[in-house]
Amino acid sequence: MAATIGQKPYEEGFRLVIAHIDCPRLDLRPNPLYESDHMSYFRTHYYGGIRKYQWATIPLAIHGVFTRADGSSVNFAIGEDENDPVFCITDLLPHLGAEQNARPLKDGIKAEELNLLIGSDAVDDENVKEAVKLNTMILLNEKYGITEKEFMRAEICLLYTSDAAD
C-alpha cells in the first residue's frame, strides 16, 4: 500500500488510486486430495490470465503453509530441490483424446480438469479402498507432519518450476 497525504482535510475531497495485478496461478481447494484410476490427485482452483491448456504437462512445484489446530504453521515447498519430485497436470495423448480434440481451443482443458497428479504408489494392503491416496497422505505426514484435515487451514499454490535457459 502506498499513500500520499495532502495538505487539506479529506472532507474537502481526495483522490483514490486503486490497482491490482493479475497473477495467474493454481491454488489447491480446501479438500484437494482424491484418488482416480489408481492415481492420487489434488483438485485446484484456477485464477486467470493465461489459457488453461497452458498449465498442462509443464513442471510444477507445490508451495504453501499449513496452519495447525494449535495455531503453529508449517511452510513447505516440494519440487524446487533437485531431489524432489516434480509434478504436472496431465493431458491426453492426441490419438486418445477425440472428444477433447473436438472442443474449441479455449475449452481444450476445462478448469475442472486442472488436477495435479501427486502420486501413483499404493500402500501394500488389498483391503484399503483408496490405497494410492492413503500412501500419498502417509508420505506427506511422514515428511511434513500434516494430516488430511489440515488442508482446510492451508494456503497452497502451484508454481512453474524450471531453471532458466538461453
Task: Identify what each model region corresponds to.
Residues 1-4, 149:
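A non-catalytic alpha/beta surface segment that caps or lines the substrate-entry region
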Residues 6-13:
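Non-transmembrane, aqueous-exposed alpha-helical and coiled segments at domain scale
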Residues 13-98:
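A generic, well-ordered mixed alpha/beta core segment in the N-terminal half of proteins
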Residues 36, 84, 103-138, 144:
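Glycine-rich, flexible beta-strand/loop modules in the N-terminal catalytic cores of phosphate-handling
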Residues 90-91, 97-112, 165:
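Structured, contiguous alpha/beta core segments that scaffold functional sites
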Residues 140, 157:
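Aromatic- and glycine-enriched pocket-lining scaffold segments that form the walls
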Residues 145-156:
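Flexible, glycine/charged-enriched surface loops at secondary-structure junctions
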Residues 160-166:
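Conserved small/polar residues in nucleotide/adenosyl-binding loops
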